[in-house]
């Protein structure tokens, strides 16, 4: 059940069930959509844990808890939140036509992710495809053995993964390494005196969050913090590619600024922001920002008492820890896609559960770490990865997913949606899912394009 699983997650963070907790789940559990994986249970549990963490923060601020309600269908729909976005009545384009599954010479199947231009160009170049068509790429991939092209794509700084069964993945060296990790962890990385939560009329009011993330999981974490009162400043680099449609899904409540860390002025600007930040969330591969001088330990030196949050594809331990990856890739290499279809004809899940749940867990870890800072002091590091979420979902077992829906009934879906007007025009998108009795979640500002705001706190 979702409630039991929510408390299982919280117990991993040393937060036990309390007598004044009020956590209610409505509507049915799995299957909501057509999948054998228990994504409704997992998503609902993660959001339920967030609700209780918000209640804990409110109790620290206002002296009383809150009642939390989670609609399981809304929670499950939130795992495909990007598919519900409309901009001026139109659905933004999100997937490159070359992205997808390709057969290899030895009878395996390779998934290639080509949504970023440099990954697309790299996949064509490395595979030997002469032109940018699916037919040419399929012909090129068919000349490679599966493990060979997987290694070549990864070694070339591109993104792809070989479809594996659950059995093959659990025996893989990285699968073995990840199996030893918790779902998420929070570790103390520095000393600092206790710091009370900032004053404010919302659980995260007054909390300042630097959001240095790009693809879905990290931006989702920032959105959850923003909808509960945090001041979230999304920092992007002007020279890096970005999928604008992600902002229309996850940018609500945030301001967006440019900083170029290749320039000394950019480093100085970010250091200045860190000096006044409560949270520093980053979604780059392990070691990437550290090479620019922003390791968690250095950030904690700049701002004792800060909460650092690291979100990556493959975790912080194991042979693939520095490998590039996205939700769709991790689904395929860990066996989720093979179970959704077959090993020969894999299918990705109807939800991006790894991205969104990783984002929810990052937000949860942030909230728990803020409570620890208020009560114990210290600087803290929260670590979450897509592959750890995949292992968690797999651990919940499978069901007969054929009874699930391709889509929620129109009237039910309409009740989960909201509309906003802003720099992107007229947007339709999902409402916040976690319902709190005292401080309902809302977005204080509409989503805005990258670089719309100055790189400074309000």
Walk through the language-model features, giving the residues of each.
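Acyl-CoA thioester-binding alpha/beta core of soluble enzymes
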Residues: 1-239, 267, 275-276, 296-315, ...
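Rossmann-fold NAD(P)-binding glycine/threonine-rich loop
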Residues: 291-339
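Short, well-ordered alpha-helix to beta-strand connector turns
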Residues: 229, 253-254, 277, 326
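Short, hinge-like loop/turn segments at secondary-structure boundaries
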Residues: 179-180, 250-253, 324-329, 400
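Glycine-rich phosphate-binding loop and adjoining beta1-alpha1-beta2 segment
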Residues: 230, 234-261, 269
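A structured beta-alpha segment of the ubiquitous adenosine-cofactor-binding alpha/beta core
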Residues: 210, 255-301
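Domain-scale recognition of functional cores that engage charged ligands
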Residues: 219-220, 230, 245, 261, ...
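Active-site PLP attachment segment
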Residues: 321-338, 343-367
């Amino acid at each position: 059940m979702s409630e039991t699983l929510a408390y299982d997650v919280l117990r991993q963070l040393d937060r036990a069930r309390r007598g004044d907790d009020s956590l209610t789940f409505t509507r049915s559990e799995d299957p909501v959509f057509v999948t054998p994986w228990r994504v409704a249970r997992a998503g609902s549990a993660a959001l339920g844990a967030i609700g209780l963490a918000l209640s804990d923060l409110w109790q620290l601020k206002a002296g009383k808890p809150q009642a939390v309600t989670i609609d399981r269908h809304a929670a499950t729909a939130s795992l495909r939140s990007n598919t519900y976005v409309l901009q001026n009545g139109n659905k933004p384009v999100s997937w490159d036509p070359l992205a997808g599954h390709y057969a290899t010479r030895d009878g395996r199947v390779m998934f290639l992710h080509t949504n970023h231009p440099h990954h697309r160009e790299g996949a064509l170049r490395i595979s030997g495809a002469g032109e940018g068509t699916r037919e040419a790429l399929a012909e090129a991939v068919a000349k490679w053995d599966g493990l060979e092209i997987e290694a070549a794509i990864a070694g070339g700084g591109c993104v792809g993964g070989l479809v594996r069964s659950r059995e093959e993945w659990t025996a893989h060296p990285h699968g073995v390494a990840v199996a030893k990790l918790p779902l998420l962890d929070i570790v103390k990385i520095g000393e600092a005196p206790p710091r009370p939560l900032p004053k404010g009329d919302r659980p995260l009011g007054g909390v300042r969050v630097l959001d240095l993330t790009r693809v879905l999981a990290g931006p989702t974490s920032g959105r959850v913090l923003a909808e509960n009162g945090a001041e979230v400043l999304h920092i992007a680099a002007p020279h890096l590619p970005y999928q604008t449609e992600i902002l229309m899904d996850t940018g609500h409540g945030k301001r967006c600024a440019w900083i170029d860390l290749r320039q000394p002025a950019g480093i100085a600007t970010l250091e200045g922001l860190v000096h006044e930040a409560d949270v520093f969330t980053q979604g780059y591969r392990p070691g990437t920002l550290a090479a620019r001088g922003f390791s968690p330990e250095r950030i904690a030196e700049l701002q004792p008492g800060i909460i650092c949050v690291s979100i990556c594809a493959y975790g912080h331990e194991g042979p693939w820890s520095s490998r590039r990856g996205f939700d769709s890739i991790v689904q395929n290499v860990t066996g989720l896609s093979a179970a959704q279809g077959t090993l020969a004809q894999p299918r990705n899940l109807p939800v991006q559960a790894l991205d969104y749940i990783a984002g929810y867990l990052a937000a949860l870890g942030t909230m728990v770490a803020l409570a620890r800072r208020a009560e114990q002091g210290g600087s803290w590091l929260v670590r979450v990865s897509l592959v750890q979420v995949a292992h968690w979902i797999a651990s919940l077992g499978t069901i007969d997913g054929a009874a699930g829906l391709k889509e929620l009934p129109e009237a039910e879906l309409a009740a989960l949606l909201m509309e906003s007007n802003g720099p992107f025009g007229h947007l339709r998108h999902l409402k916040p899912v976690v319902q709190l009795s005292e401080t309902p979640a809302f977005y204080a500002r509409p989503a805005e394009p990258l670089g719309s705001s100055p790189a400074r706190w309000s």
